[in-house]
Amino acid sequence: MESGSTAKTGDFFYGWDLLYKTVKADVSKKSDLLIALVHFLLTKHYNFRCVGVGDDKTLPEEEGSELLPDSWNDDDTKYSLRYVHDKMLYLLLGHITEGSLLINLLDINTKKVSNICVEPETLVPEVKGGITTIMPSASEIVERYRRELLDPVFTGNSREVTTQTTNSPRPIGSDPDPLRIGEPRRGGSFIPSAFEPRPFGFPDVGRGDLDPLGRGGHGNLFSFPSRPNMGPGPVPRFDPFNPLNPNRPGQGGINPDHMRPPDWNPDYYM
């Protein structure tokens, strides 16, 4: 839908004269022209197509027409027109009561409905002539139709822009891999998903033992302070890499007891 300033230009009403010529012989009351103006707005600027009269809520198979159907204004007090847009059905209903015309637009799918009340006697001084003669304030009427009747139910332009944005091509390789679990880890320690990283602030001692691929360090295989040089590389703490040296403290050999065993007094006890 064009903006309000565009609606006031002659280009906006281009095509109205053709529509008016097809219905002017049938126009019998001023409210007919107000309904015809809604029809023009729907078909010319919102790409609706009329599929007949009535209030049947069944979506028809035909594509519809830009022209008003036969018998569209046969009833003296009401109007019922059916439209389709993008395979969705809409009903345009009008009721004449106490000199006013109440118009409703109903979206059959979403059940959204809008309404507007206009005064035919005030807005339509003549039923014959050009658009500026029969409806001098046609631009203002169109703006009211758009704001009060169409926008609450149908936002065609906004919907099209959203669809184009959603369907815009994505760069190659941007599609997610359904078999991929999380991002790959680049170096550092391996922490299974069920473990909290460093829960008590301790270093990552033993974390490497949890990694079946051997990433993230040596795990529990490290040198003790009491055995600083146990051989090349990390060694198991429970199985020293080299033979025991009895002359080095802390690596086996005879170590006298500090307390005398009962009833035992060997010569070497000190």
From Swiss-Prot:
Disruption phenotype: Larval lethal. Mutant larvae develop melanotic tumors. ADP-ribosylation by Tnks increases its affinity for assembly chaperones PSMD9 and PMSD5, sequestering them away from the proteasome Rpt base subunits and promoting in this way 26S proteasome assembly. Also interferes with its inhibitory effect on 20S proteasome. The keyword NADP does not apply. This is Proteasome inhibitor PI31 subunit. The modification Phosphoserine is found at residues 168, 189. Residues 158-169 have a biased composition (Polar residues). Coiled coil: none annotated. A motif (HbYX motif) lies at residues 268-270. Interacts with ntc. Interacts with Tnks (via ANK repeats). Interacts with 20S proteasome subunits Prosalpha1, Prosalpha3, Prosalpha4 and Prosalpha6, but not with Prosalpha2 and Prosalpha5. The interaction with Prosalpha4 is reduced by PI31 ADP-ribosylation. Interacts with the 19S assembly chaperones PSMD5 and PSMD9; these interactions are increased by PI31 ADP-ribosylation. Belongs to the proteasome inhibitor PI31 family. Plays an important role in the control of proteasome function. Inhibits the hydrolysis of protein and peptide substrates by the 20S proteasome. Enhances 26S proteasome function by promoting its assembly through the interaction with the assembly chaperones PSMD9 and PMSD5. Functions together with ntc to control non-apoptotic caspase activation during sperm individualization. In testis, is required for proper protein degradation and germline cell cycle progression. PANTHER family: PROTEASOME INHIBITOR, PROTEASOME INHIBITOR PI31 SUBUNIT. Its main location: cytoplasm. Residues 158-270 are annotated as: Disordered. GO terms for cellular component: cytoplasm; proteasome complex; sperm individualization complex. It is found in: Cytoplasm. Keywords: ADP-ribosylation, Cytoplasm, Developmental protein, Phosphoprotein, Proteasome. Residues 177-186 have a biased composition (Basic and acidic residues). InterPro entries: PI31-like (IPR045128), PI31_Prot_N (IPR021625). GO terms for molecular function: endopeptidase inhibitor activity; proteasome binding. It comes from Drosophila melanogaster (Fruit fly). The keyword Cytoplasm applies. In testis, expressed in germline stem cells and primary spermatocytes (at protein level).
